[in-house]
């Protein structure tokens, strides 16, 4: 099959319909200037063959294949290729009867792409199958040799060359089919997995469940009969046992009483043996003390002597230590004295200040005395002037005149008041007479007024009976508003802190239904209460990541949470029942307290509060570390030989016994625990306010009905009160009321006048007495004048004396002030002297310390000798113990007798209790037998079978106690089974089993298919290997022949890489003459192009295609090589059609038909020339 004609219309540069006909069946060449459209003819052939990689036809999309991309009015591109199909043995499958085959492909801009085969529409797959059947696969075009492909072949690696060989052999298509088969296998495996998943997750669990339900159903059905049998068996045994105990109780009581008598006799005998042992022990003890006492005494005296000497030396040591201690105490006293002097200096300074203030007070006292003196002198001058006192402005005669005027005025007012009383009494009498005439009207008004007042009082009592005070609800609502505001503020604070501490929130879903959440205690950080806020940084560093651990009651709870708790983050869980905690040993804690002081290093565990149930978890987190106040203390605790325990300072620095130190900047140290502490306080405060808010809400709710009732009654009270006030106003307008008011007013005026008359009479009497007194004073003034003057002069003298004393005190204060200043200076000098003495004492303490150390060494030596002697004394005591062995034997025998006596007493008590028990059992069992016979009527008819072998009541072959346990268990099981048993389980189980068998059958079928496909793939792999080997041999032979034709005097071959076989890849080797080149880099560019072209043509020759297209493959070759290509094509490809694009005459002159392209007026044209006549 070869091309006869190509028709192009609107394709690339061929705008108008252009028919290229007369193709030679063997060798055709196309030439022309660059851009004239020669390669477009090759592109049109590829276009018809169905190419999908448009880069090989130099286009980005199909629209670019249309002339000027549809911009010149041409909107479609059509290419038709006519093939000569006269050779039927080379025809495509299914087209053997067609002498010609015309394949057309058309694309429309923005439209669809269509194919036609012999004028009929065809699918792209049909076109591909047509060309594939004659080795024309345009999407893997080994028949299309472009100049770029030559270069590409030169750069190929061995596996890529092998891939070209596979393509030539046709095994590449097998690989594609193999991949499809493997995908099919994968799909079948997916199906098998789905079946397995269905079996594992649905069918098998359901089948297993139904199998269990079936077993339960059968167990329940069979258990009912067994339950009845066991119940009768146990009742029969209970009856027999009760009869047996009843009958044996009578005999047992007599036997027990006989045993009691025997025990009493044995007890008396044992007591005699105990007394005998006591005598022997006493005799042996006296003999031991007599024989060994002297030696012990000597050694004891030696030990005592050493102890006394050691005491003397220890005394000296204590004296020196006391002296040293005394000197140290003196130092402390001096230090305290210095401190006291400093304090006294401050006190003297304060006293000076106080003295100055006292002087100011004395100055004020002196001023006050001066003022008093002035007043006395003034009064003295007044007496001299004839006044009663110094303050009076008038003399006694003027005062007498004024008093007489006052007597006259008081007498006039008294007369007027008596006249008014007479008038009021007269008018009151008249008004009362008029009032009596209006009495009936007054009684009627009074009755109605009383009724209205009673109504008001009744409503008031009803109001007072309501347990509600006016304004109480408003106060509660005010409290509610205040509490609500506080609660909202605290809730905002809690939310803010909770958001900042989100990592401490542990949220989970219940892992099982009805899960007890109290088993989950919470995060460690939220379970502790820090006792001292200053230790928060140290505690946070001590705990580290354990602060985020979650505490639960057991490992089962932890496992449930991890597996089914839907946890949002990774957590570490501490189960209280399994956690291995470690706490620093008490002796280490005591050693630490002795070394650095109890307050300087504390166990971290003691600094936190927690619930007792959390003890194990808290010991695990905080039990192994000390918290120290300073770095020096922390070092001492960590590195001391007797302690060696991790320690943390308050600033968060860590000291490990291994020598590892961790510290430095710690931004926000303890911040998390502080925030947690603040959060706990806020939550506690929030709960308190929420409780108070709830209480207020509750009170409001309780008071609402009372408030409503109070409001209603209060409204009634206001209404009644208003009604009463209106009535009172009306009553005030009637005649009787007016007369009553007038009488009342007159009575008040009369009463007031009567009370005033007494006052006026008293005032008149006082004025009269004052006149008399003044008259007497004037008479006595001359007599007393001299006395008063003397008294005043005496006072003046006294005040002057006091002023002198105050002046003296003032001077004394000034002197005291100077004295205090001098004392202050003296104290400062004494302080300086004490500081010098302190320095000398510190030197003396250093000397005494050395002497104490020497004396301590001496005491230690004596202690060693004393300890050795004491050890020897103890050895002698040990020997004395051996002497005690015999005594111990007697003591042991005595103790055995005592124990025997105790046992017999206990046995006697048991026997007495047993007698009581048997008598009780006899009575109880008699009642029990009667009740059993009465309750179970079948006992009377089957009683004779109880306990007989071979019957249902054989108590020997079947243990009654085991039967009782079986009965109880069976009753429990049957009760549970009856609730759970599924009555339809038999039919459901059969249906589920059928589904299971069907799926297993389907699965087996699929797995058999998989096995067959795998086997076929293995067989085809072997055939592929054989085919590739044959292909390699044939292509290798043609490769060498073609290359030697193109480049005479050379050889070429394909061989596997070193240390490999041909399936690992093939590489090209070249020889010039008989010398094989080590590398292709030794070849020139033209030689390498010929070598690549030879390989390509050799591959094509293995399975020749009907058509080959070469596009300027001779571009890099000189003229002689180009001519050789033409000759090679004629020699090696006699049955294939070649279409070659070339610009060199050496190439296209060898062609039978030459097509020349030109570019005229923007459109390509083609001219055919026959260069040689085909034979």
Swiss-Prot record:
Residues 518-638 form the SMC hinge domain. The SMC hinge domain, which separates the large intramolecular coiled coil regions, allows the heterodimerization with SMC4, forming a V-shaped heterodimer. It is found in: Nucleus. The keyword Transport does not apply. ATP binds at residues 32-39. Keywords: ATP-binding, Cell cycle, Cell division, Coiled coil, DNA condensation, Meiosis, Mitosis, Nucleotide-binding, Nucleus. Central component of the condensin complex, a complex required for conversion of interphase chromatin into mitotic-like condense chromosomes. The condensin complex probably introduces positive supercoils into relaxed DNA in the presence of type I topoisomerases and converts nicked DNA into positive knotted forms in the presence of type II topoisomerases. Also involved in chromosome segregation in meiosis. Residues 172-508, 673-1028 form a coiled coil. Forms a heterodimer with SMC4. Component of the condensin complex, which contains the SMC2 and SMC4 heterodimer, and three non SMC subunits that probably regulate the complex: CAPH, CAPD2 and CAPG. This is Structural maintenance of chromosomes protein 2-1. The keyword Electron transport does not apply. GO terms for cellular component: condensin complex; nucleus. Residues 2-1161 form the Zinc-hook domain. Highly expressed in roots and young floral buds. PANTHER family: STRUCTURAL MAINTENANCE OF CHROMOSOMES PROTEIN 3. InterPro entries: P-loop_NTPase, RecF/RecN/SMC_N, SMC, Smc2_ABC, SMC_hinge, SMC_hinge_sf. One of its GO terms (biological process) is meiotic cell cycle. GO terms for molecular function: ATP binding; ATP hydrolysis activity. Belongs to the SMC family. SMC2 subfamily.
């Amino acid at each position: 099959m070869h091309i006869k004609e190509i028709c192009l219309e609107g394709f690339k540069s061929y705008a108008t319909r252009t028919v290229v006909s007369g193709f030679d069946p063997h060798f055709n060449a196309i030439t022309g200037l660059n851009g004239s459209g020669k390669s477009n003819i090759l592109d049109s052939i590829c276009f018809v063959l169905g190419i999908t990689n448009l880069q090989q036809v130099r286009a980005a999309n199909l629209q670019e294949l249309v002339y000027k991309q549809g911009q010149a009015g041409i909107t479609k591109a059509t290419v038709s290729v006519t093939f000569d199909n006269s050779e039927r043995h080379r025809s495509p499958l299914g087209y053997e009867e067609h002498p010609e085959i015309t394949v057309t492909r058309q694309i429309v801009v923005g439209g669809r792409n269509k194919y036609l085969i012999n004028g009929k529409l065809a699918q792209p797959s049909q076109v591909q199958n047509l060309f594939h059947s004659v080795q024309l696969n345009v999407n893997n075009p080994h028949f299309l040799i472009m100049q770029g492909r030559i270069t590409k072949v030169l750069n190929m690696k061995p596996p890529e060359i092998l891939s070209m060989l596979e393509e030539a052999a046709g095994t590449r298509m097998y690989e594609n089919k193999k991949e499809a088969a493997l995908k099919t296998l994968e799909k079948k495996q997916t199906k098998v997995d789905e079946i397995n998943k269905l079996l594992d997750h649905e069918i098998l669990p359901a089948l297993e469940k139904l199998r269990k339900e079936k077993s339960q159903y059968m167990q329940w059905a069979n258990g009912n009969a067994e339950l009845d049998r066991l119940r009768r068996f146990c009742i029969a045994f209970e009856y027999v046992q009760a009869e047996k105990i009843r009958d044996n109780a009578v005999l047992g009581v007599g036997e027990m009483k006989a045993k009691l008598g025997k025990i009493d006799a044995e007890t008396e005998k044992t007591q005699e043996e105990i007394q005998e042992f006591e005598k022997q022990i006493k005799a042996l003890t006296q003999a031991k003390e007599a024989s060994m006492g002297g030696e012990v005494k000597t050694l004891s005296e030696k030990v005592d002597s050493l102890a006394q000497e050691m005491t003397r030396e220890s005394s000296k040591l204590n004296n020196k230590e006391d002296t040293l201690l005394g000197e140290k105490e003196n130092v402390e006293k001096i230090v305290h004295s210095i401190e006291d002097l400093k304090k006294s200096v401050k006190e003297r300074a304060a006293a000076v200040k106080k003295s100055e203030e006292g002087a100011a007070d004395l100055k004020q006292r002196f001023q006050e005395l001066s003022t008093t003196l002035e007043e006395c002198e003034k009064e003295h001058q007044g007496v001299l002037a004839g006044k009663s006192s110094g303050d009076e402005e008038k003399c006694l005669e003027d005062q007498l005149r004024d008093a007489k005027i006052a007597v006259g005025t008081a007498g006039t007012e008294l007369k007027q008041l008596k006249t008014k009383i007479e008038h009021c009494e007269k008018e009151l009498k008249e008004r009362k007479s008029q009032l009596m005439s209006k009495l009936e009207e007054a009684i009627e008004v009074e009755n109605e007024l009383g009724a209205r007042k009673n109504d008001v009082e009744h409503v008031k009592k009803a109001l007072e009976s309501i347990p509600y005070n006016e304004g109480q609800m408003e106060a509660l609502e005010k409290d509610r508003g205040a509490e609500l505001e506080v609660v909202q503020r605290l809730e905002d604070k809690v939310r803010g802190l909770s958001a900042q501490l989100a990592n401490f929130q542990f949220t989970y879903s219940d892992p099982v239904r009805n899960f007890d959440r109290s088993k989950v205690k919470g995060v460690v950080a939220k379970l502790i209460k820090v006792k001292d806020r200053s230790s928060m940084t140290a505690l946070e560093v001590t705990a580290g990541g354990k602060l985020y651990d979650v505490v639960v009651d057991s490992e089962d709870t932890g496992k449930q949470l991890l597996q089914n708790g839907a946890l949002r983050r990774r957590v570490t869980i501490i189960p209280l029942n399994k956690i291995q905690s470690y706490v620093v040993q008490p002796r280490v804690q005591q050693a630490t307290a002795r070394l650095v002081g109890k307050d300087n290093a504390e166990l971290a565990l003691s600094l936190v509060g927690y619930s007792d149930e959390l003890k194990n978890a808290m010991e695990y987190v905080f039990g192994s570390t000390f918290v120290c106040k300073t770095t020096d203390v922390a070092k001492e605790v960590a590195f001391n030989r007797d302690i060696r325990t991790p320690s943390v300072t308050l600033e968060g620095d860590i000291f490990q016994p291994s020598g590892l130190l961790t510290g430095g900047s710690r931004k926000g140290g303890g911040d998390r625990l502080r925030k947690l502490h603040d959060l706990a306080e806020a939550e506690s405060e929030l709960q308190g306010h929420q409780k108070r808010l709830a209480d207020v809400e509750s009170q409001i709710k309780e008071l609402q009905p009372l408030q409503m009732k109070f409001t209603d009654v209060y409204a009634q009270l206001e209404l009644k009160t208003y009604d009463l006030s209106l009535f009172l106003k009306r009553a005030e307008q009637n005649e009787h009321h007016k007369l009553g008011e007038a009488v009342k007013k007159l009575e008040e005026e009369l009463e007031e006048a009567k009370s005033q008359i007494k006052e006026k009479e008293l005032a008149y009497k006082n004025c009269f007495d004052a006149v008399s007194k003044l008259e007497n004073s004037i008479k006595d003034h001359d007599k007393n004048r001299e006395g008063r003057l003397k008294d005043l002069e005496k006072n003046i003298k006294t005040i002057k004396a006091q002023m002198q004393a105050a002046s003296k005190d003032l001077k004394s204060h000034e002197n005291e002030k100077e004295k205090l200043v001098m004392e202050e200076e003296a104290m400062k000098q004494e302080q300086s002297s004490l500081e010098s003495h302190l320095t000398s004492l510190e030197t003396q303490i250093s000397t005494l310390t050395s002497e104490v150390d020497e004396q301590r060494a001496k005491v230690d030596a004596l202690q060693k000798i004393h300890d050795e002697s004491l050890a020897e004394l103890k050895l002698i005591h040990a020997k004395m113990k051996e002497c005690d062995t015999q005594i111990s034997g007697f003591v042991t025998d005595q103790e055995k007798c005592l124990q025997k006596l105790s046992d017999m007493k206990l046995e006697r008590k048991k026997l007495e209790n047993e007698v009581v028990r048997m008598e009780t059992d006899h009575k109880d069992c008699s009642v029990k037998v009667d009740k059993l016979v009465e309750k179970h009527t079948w006992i009377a008819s089957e009683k004779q079978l109880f306990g007989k072998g071979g019957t249902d009541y054989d108590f020997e072959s079947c243990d009654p106690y085991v039967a009782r346990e079986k009965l109880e268990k069976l009753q429990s099981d049957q009760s549970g089974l009856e609730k759970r048993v599924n009555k339809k389980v038999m039919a459901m189980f059969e249906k589920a089993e059928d589904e299971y068998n069907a799926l297993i059958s389907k699965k087996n079928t699929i797995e058999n298919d998989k096995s067959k496909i795998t086997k076929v793939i293995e067989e085809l792999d072997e055939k592929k290997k054989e085919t590739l080997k044959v292909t390699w041999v044939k292509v290798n032979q043609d490769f060498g022949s073609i290359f030697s034709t193109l480049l005479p005097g050379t050889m070429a071959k394909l061989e596997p890489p070193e240390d490999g076989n041909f399936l690992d890849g093939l590489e090209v080797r070249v020889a010039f003459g008989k010398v094989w080149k080590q590398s292709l880099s030794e070849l020139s560019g033209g030689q390498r192009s010929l070598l690549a072209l030879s390989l390509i043509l050799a591959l094509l020759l293995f399975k020749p295609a009907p058509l080959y297209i070469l596009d300027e493959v001779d571009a890099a070759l000189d003229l002689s090589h180009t001519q050789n290509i033409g000759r090679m094509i004629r020699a090696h490809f006699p049955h294939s059609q070649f279409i070659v694009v070339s610009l060199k005459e050496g190439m296209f002159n060898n062609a039978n038909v030459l097509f020349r392209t030109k570019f005229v007026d923007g459109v390509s044209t083609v001219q055919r020339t026959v260069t040689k006549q085909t034979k």
